[in-house]
UniProtKB/Swiss-Prot annotation:
Additional detail: Negative results: inhibits with low efficiency Kv1.5/KCNA5, Kv2.1/KCNB1, Kv7.1/KCNQ1 and ERG/KCNH2. Does not inhibit Kv1.4/KCNA4, Kv3.1/KCNC1, Kv7.2/KCNQ2 and ERG1/Kv11.1/KCNH2.
Keyword NAD attributed: no
Protein name according to UniProt: Potassium channel toxin alpha-KTx 4.1
Keywords: Disulfide bond, Ion channel impairing toxin, Neurotoxin, Potassium channel impairing toxin, Secreted, Signal, Toxin, Voltage-gated potassium channel impairing toxin
Listed InterPro entries: Scorpion_toxin-like_sf (IPR036574), Scorpion_toxinS_K_inh (IPR001947)
Taxon lineage: Eukaryota, Metazoa, Ecdysozoa, Arthropoda, Chelicerata
Biological source species: Tityus serrulatus
UniProt remark on domains: Has the structural arrangement of an alpha-helix connected to a beta-sheet by disulfide bonds (CSalpha/beta).
GO CC term, one of those recorded: extracellular region
Length: 59
C-alpha cells in the first residue's frame, strides 16, 4: 500500500511539471481552431486551445 501512495505522489508531481509548460497568449478566440495559427506564430508550434476566450498554447 505504501508503494501505491509513493507512485501516486510521483504521478501528481510529474503532471504538475508537465502542465506548467502551457503558455497563455493575449489573443481572443471563440473556438480552438482560431488559436492554431496564433500559437504557431507565438511559440512556433500549432498546438493550443481556446479557454475562456483566450488562447492557451502548448509547446
Amino acid at each position: 500500500m505504501k508503494a501505491f501512495y509513493g507512485i501516486l505522489i510521483i504521478f501528481i508531481l510529474i503532471s504538475m511539471i508537465d502542465l506548467s509548460k502551457q503558455v497563455f497568449i493575449n489573443a481572443k478566440c471563440r473556438g480552438s481552431p482560431e488559436c492554431l495559427p496564433k500559437c504557431k506564430e507565438a511559440i512556433g508550434k500549432a498546438a493550443g486551445k481556446c479557454m475562456n476566450g483566450k488562447c492557451k498554447c502548448y509547446p
